[in-house]
Amino acid sequence: MSLVPITNVGEHGIVKDINSWQLPPNAWTEGNNIRAEHNAIQKSPGYLEVMASCPIAPYFITNLEVGGANYWIVGGLAKIYVHNGTTWTDITRASGGDYSATARENWTATVLGGILVMSNGYDAPQFWALAAGIPAVATKMADLTYWPASTECKSLRAFKSFLIALNVTKSTVPYTSLVKWSTAAATQAVPVSWDETSATVDAGEYALEDSKGIIVDGLPLRGEFMIYKQYSTYKMSYVGNPFIFAFTQLSPNVGALAKNCIREFDGGHFVMAYGDMYINSGDKL
């Protein structure tokens, strides 16, 4: 029997959901401890523990790179730690006590003008102030300046020069369909107002009440902000005064499964939803 040369053996990788006789010769139907890369098959290097030295259980991890400085920030249930490439430092807020985060809700993180802002849905949002344009491990997290009292949000995201709070609780009353945005922030500063009743700032609120389910999360997509409820998706567009933002329903049937289940890539958003996974191109899901 003659040998048949097969090239580009890593072109397709492992394909399990198509019948083997329908696949090209250089596709694999099964494999263990291998990975396809550069049109070749390589041995998988396995796993390497990277948080062994972290002083707390790393329920949430995010990266911040500002002015040449690179930090890994870990959110635990009660504290926040940062790693500067050498050591771990506790940057939990100095006043207000430990946090009340839960494993179920967890944290969200966003960056506005180089300032890291985190929220867990149970405490006031936290921000890491800059010193000479960069954060310092000696600086503690603190309750977000100008944030309204007795108010929490399940997710907090940056969009343009604004902070967008999603699924808001006011004085223990949940407004699960409420979108609340700040006034525009100055460079390397947090917004100075969240007062939706003031005519002198751009802060405002809008309730997405024409569909079922609660607001889960949101992320910018090119020039717009996508808001994901449990079973629907909305587009938030900047229109300026007097309304500041306009809201349009993008999908009445597809939302997001949970917080941090949306990721941006070159073609749009990759969304984990109930029962399936979707691509949000900005025009449709």
Go through the PLM ranges and name each one.
Residues 1-89, 148-235:
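N-terminal beta-propeller domains
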Residues 5-10, 211-285:
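Beta-sheet-dominated scaffold domains
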Residues 82, 127-129, 235, 279:
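Conserved blade-register residue in beta-propeller folds
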Residues 84-86, 130-133, 239-241, 283:
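Short loop/turn segments that connect beta-strands within beta-propeller blades
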Residues 90-94, 136-145, 192-195, 245-250:
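Beta-propeller fold detector
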Residues 96-113:
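Beta-sandwich interaction modules
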Residues 123-124, 169-173, 278:
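Short glycine/acidic-enriched loop and turn motifs that connect beta-strands
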Residues 130-157:
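Asp-box/WD-like beta-propeller blade repeats and closely related beta-sheet repeat scaffolds
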